[in-house]
């Protein structure tokens, strides 16, 4: 089939045109059985393809027809041997990767700055995480990728690990030398699992970091909805044969997936793949140019800083994605959280993320020059508004806490008897649940972690 075809979406449209009389779920029956206000807002076409896995429409759990064709086209587009559609988000795809290679007691090498879904899968599988410390940027106060040296050390000390998980690129857009990491892991016959939640587009442009499949990784959870144009909660899992059992992967993702599959989400993956495969390079080039214009404009504003190519040169910052706009506001004497609230209240601008020192804005295929000009004007106003704080020497100090050490396995801690105590009394106690801020969904506290007074003060 051609990458210009959309077998899943096209079949859904043809099915809706036949207008069959439905005596199956969903009970709203093309919108007729739901609140009219919502029906009018969503629209007839969307509700007409809100369908389930009846015989003419294939079955995500055992695809043989239009879903299989759509997944095969996605595999070809991303350079995978197999692609599985996920309507459980990239979290579901990440959990599938971990649970496909790990069982109770198995070791898995992971960066400490992994997403909650990785730790959730570790709890479900009973695996033992071996943390690799990411490189920390003392100027921005953010985590980058893992270094080649940390990977070498982890592999030498834990050559019996069942998998190595890598984030590529990070939430902030930085990438390590993934190809070399893959080669290292494969020399130990250890499969490489890639959290590619923020990198669906990198496969389709040569100036962006190397994608997981291009680097030879074994599995990659790739979030099409975040940056690739599909609907929220839709994602894909790309798999290469060899070190992983594809049938087992399919069984795990089926186990984690609802049987009431959303065909709207599946169709959005089909059409997003078509656009990326056929127009992606040109569209992403426009997006990069737009982002670089924004970066240059921000760096001309006093007391603001937007990192770019000058950050490259370490093992953990081998390459970067310029469409991620990090704006460091600490030299204004304010926090990223304050900047986020100010932009919302003054300019009706919503950013992707804020932390103590930065805000993060994503430039995607959906942005326009008008939108980015508004952002630039807003940041100029922000800098002017808080310039007095900067001139007075008010500074936000970057303080990076130590990475906690596990006292128990995450699974043992999670399923242990627990008690709720005041936060200030938690020093020396073992955490039983996740504590995190979303976005990005990286656990601050992880089940099994032992926390001390200084760590608690910094995290608070």
Swiss-Prot record:
It is found in: Cytoplasm. GO terms for biological process: putrescine biosynthetic process; spermidine biosynthetic process. Catalyzes the formation of agmatine from arginine. It comes from Bacillus cereus (strain ATCC 14579 / DSM 31 / CCUG 7414 / JCM 2152 / NBRC 15305 / NCIMB 9373 / NCTC 2599 / NRRL B-3711). Disulfide bonds: none annotated. This is Arginine decarboxylase. GO terms for cellular component: cytoplasm. It catalyses: L-arginine + H(+) = agmatine + CO2. Belongs to the Orn/Lys/Arg decarboxylase class-I family. The lineage of its organism: Bacteria, Bacillati, Bacillota, Bacilli, Bacillales. The keyword Cell wall biogenesis/degradation does not apply. Its cofactor is pyridoxal 5'-phosphate. InterPro entries: Orn/Lys/Arg_deCO2ase_major_dom, Orn_Lys_Arg_decarboxylase-I, Prn/Lys/Arg_de-COase_C, PyrdxlP-dep_Trfase, PyrdxlP-dep_Trfase_major, PyrdxlP-dep_Trfase_small.
């Amino acid at each position: 089939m051609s990458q210009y075809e959309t077998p899943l979406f096209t079949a859904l449209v043809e099915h809706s045109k036949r207008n069959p009389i439905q005596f199956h779920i969903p009970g709203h029956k093309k919108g007729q059985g739901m609140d009219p206000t919502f029906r009018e807002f969503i629209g007839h076409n969307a509700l007409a393809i809100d369908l389930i896995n009846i015989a003419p429409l294939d079955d995500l759990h055992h695809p043989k027809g239009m879903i299989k064709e759509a997944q095969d086209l996605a595999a070809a587009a991303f350079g995978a041997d197999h692609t599985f559609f996920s309507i459980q988000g990239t979290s579901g795809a990440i959990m599938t990767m971990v649970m496909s290679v790990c069982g109770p007691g198995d070791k898995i090498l992971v960066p400490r700055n992994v997403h909650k879904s990785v730790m959730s899968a570790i709890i479900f599988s009973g695996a033992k995480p071996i943390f690799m410390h990411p490189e920390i940027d003392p100027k921005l106060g953010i985590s980058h990728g893992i270094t080649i040296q940390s990977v070498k050390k982890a592999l030498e000390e834990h050559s019996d690990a069942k998998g190595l998980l890598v984030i590529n690129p990070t939430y902030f857009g930085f990438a390590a030398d993934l190809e070399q990491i893959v080669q290292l892991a494969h020399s130990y016959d250890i499969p490489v699992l890639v959290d590619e939640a923020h990198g669906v587009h990198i496969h389709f442009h040569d100036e962006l970091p190397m994608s997981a499949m291009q680097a030879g990784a074994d599995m990659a959870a790739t979030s099409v909805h975040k940056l690739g144009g599909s609907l929220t909660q839709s994602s894909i899992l790309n798999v290469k044969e060899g070190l992983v059992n594809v049938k087992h992967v399919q069984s795990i993702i089926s186990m984690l997936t609802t049987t009431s599959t959303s065909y709207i989400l599946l169709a959005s993956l089909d059409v997003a793949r078509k656009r990326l495969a056929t127009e992606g390079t040109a569209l992403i080039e426009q997006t990069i140019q737009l982002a670089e214009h924004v970066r240059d404009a921000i760096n001309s504003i006093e007391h603001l800083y937007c990192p770019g190519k000058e950050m490259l040169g370490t093992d953990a910052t081998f390459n970067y994605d310029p469409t991620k706009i990090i704006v460091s506001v600490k030299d204004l004497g304010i926090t990223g959280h304050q900047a986020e609230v100010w932009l919302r209240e003054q300019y009706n601008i919503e950013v992707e993320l804020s932390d103590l020192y930065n805000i993060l804005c994503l430039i995607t295929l959906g942005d326009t020059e008008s939108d980015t000009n508004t952002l630039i004007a807003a940041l100029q106003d922000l800098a002017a508004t808080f310039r007095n704080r900067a001139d007075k020497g008010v500074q936000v100090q970057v303080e990076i806490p130590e990475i906690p050490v596990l006292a128990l396995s995450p699974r043992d801690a999670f399923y242990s008897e627990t008690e709720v105590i005041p936060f200030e009394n938690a020093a020396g106690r073992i955490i039983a649940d996740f504590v995190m801020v979303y976005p990005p969904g990286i656990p601050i506290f992880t089940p099994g972690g032992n926390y001390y007074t200084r760590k608690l003060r910094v995290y608070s």
